[in-house]
From Swiss-Prot:
It comes from Ehrlichia ruminantium (strain Welgevonden). The lineage of its organism: Bacteria, Pseudomonadati, Pseudomonadota, Alphaproteobacteria, Rickettsiales. It holds the Pfam family RuvX. Belongs to the YqgF nuclease family. This is Putative pre-16S rRNA nuclease. GO terms for molecular function: nuclease activity. It is found in: Cytoplasm. GO terms for cellular component: cytosol. GO terms for biological process: rRNA 5'-end processing. It comes from the Bacteria. Its EC number is 3.1.-.-.
Length: 156
């Protein structure tokens, strides 16, 4: 099922499984996973997109291989919180993933995540060329960590 409300998503998370996060882009998708306690986001990989069918299968494979039970996908709203063409593609992708694999997906506002990822890499003295290779998975980590922190607050 598709969730846009963190309270509702928190109630359906399988606490015995990890959470996977995607930073969705036109050419690449950053992937991050929670640790087994669902407290810490860990970078996984940058997946280079092929076509929707292959992308769905490959990303679901990562979910299964890493014992994840639900997914967070960054929703790239504009600066005013409005949807755009990429948001439509993200929602279409999420709905196809749900239809094919029956998993719970939470769409999280990811405004500024790529900019923050670039800034983190710069602060770590990573050269721009190298940073471009990892920005997507850093962005996925930042998105997932925000969600994990929100879930932790709601569980208190």
């Amino acid at each position: 099922m598709l969730y846009k409300n963190i309270n509702e998503f928190e109630q359906v998370i399988d606490k015995t499984k990890r959470i996977m996060c995607l930073d969705f882009g036109e050419k690449k998708i950053g992937v991050a996973l929670s640790d087994k306690t669902n407290l810490i986001a860990i970078p996984h990989s940058v997946y280079v997109r092929k076509n929707t069918r292959k992308d769905l299968g490959s990303l679901y494979g990562i979910l299964i291989e890493n014992d994840a039970g639900s997914m967070v996908i960054g929703l790239p709203l504009d600066l005013f919180g409005m949807g755009n063409e990429l948001c439509d593609k993200v929602m279409l992708f999420a709905n196809r993933m749900i239809k094919k694999y029956a998993i719970n997906i939470y769409l999280h506002d990811e405004r500024y995540s790529t900019a923050m990822a670039t800034r983190v890499a710069k602060l770590a003295n990573i050269k721009r060329k190298e940073s471009q290779k990892i920005d997507d998975k850093i962005a996925a980590v930042l998105i997932l960590q925000q969600v994990l922190d929100m879930v932790k607050i709601y569980q208190m």
